[in-house]
Amino acid sequence: MGRGKIEIKRIENATNRQVTFSKRRGGLLKKANELAVLCDARVGVVIFSSTGKMFEYCSPTCSLRELIEHYQTVTNTHFEEINHDQQIFVEMTRMRNEMEKLDGGIRRFTGDDLSNLTLADINDLEQQLEFSVTKVRARKHQLLNQQLDNLRRKEHILEDQNSFLCRMINENHHQAAVGGGDVKAMVEMAPVLSMLTAAPAYYGEESSSTALQLTPPLHAVDAAAAAGFRLQPTQPNLQDPGCSSSSFHAAAAGHGLQLW
């Protein structure tokens, strides 16, 4: 029973196409070898698959190069030899022309080479420069607005800190006044007052809405605290002769101090 005829057309299925290629390639190379051996013929076969892979066969009595040279001699055809030096020269010339063109454009934009420009070219150049200046100014204003926003945020933060510290000072003054001069509150507020006193040096000499206005100042608080009470050393030889023990205890009790 004979095989049915296969329609000669491209096989659409990739797997079937690859299988058919492998079978037909093997058969073709086998036939070429049989022809070269049986008939003492000079046979050369070069095959490229659809993926670009190369397969070749040449009869044992010669090389593929010899077959190609013989083919050129018989048909009087010659393959064009590639002159790499010529290709390099052409590429260098193209790059040199491109560099000169770019350099000329830079000189025109900087105003160093305007002698060869016509009136229309100068008008086009002017429009391009004005467009570039507009873009630069827009970017400049954007950066300035960002800096202003950052400064405003910092100002609000400093104002909040200033308000918080002022409230703390007022509350401690109020507690000290109600408690009859609470020395402990004054001592606790000393680091805060020192920090607030040093604030102008930290933020600079400029006057702003964030400057701290303190009432009373630190030296006034220290003077009031010193005038409100007087402590005597515990050792007898260091005590003030003019201050008796009873008066000392009374003064300490009046100011809310506990003696250990």
Curated annotation (Swiss-Prot):
Keywords: DNA-binding, Nucleus, Transcription, Transcription regulation
K-box domain ranges (all copies): 85-175
Cell compartments where the protein resides: Nucleus
Domain MADS-box: 1-61
Biological process according to GO: positive regulation of programmed cell death; positive regulation of transcription by RNA polymerase II; regulation of transcription by RNA polymerase II; seed development; starch biosynthetic process
Expression (tissue specificity): Expressed in developing seeds.
Recorded GO CC terms: nucleus
Zinc in keyword set: no
Record-level Gene Ontology MF annotations: DNA-binding transcription factor activity, RNA polymerase II-specific; protein dimerization activity; RNA polymerase II cis-regulatory region sequence-specific DNA binding
Transcription recorded as keyword: yes
Purpose of the protein: Probable transcription factor.
Name used for this protein in its record: MADS-box transcription factor 29
Organism the protein comes from: Oryza sativa subsp. japonica (Rice)
Lineage, highest ranks first: Eukaryota, Viridiplantae, Streptophyta, Embryophyta, Tracheophyta
Recorded name of the encoding gene: MADS29
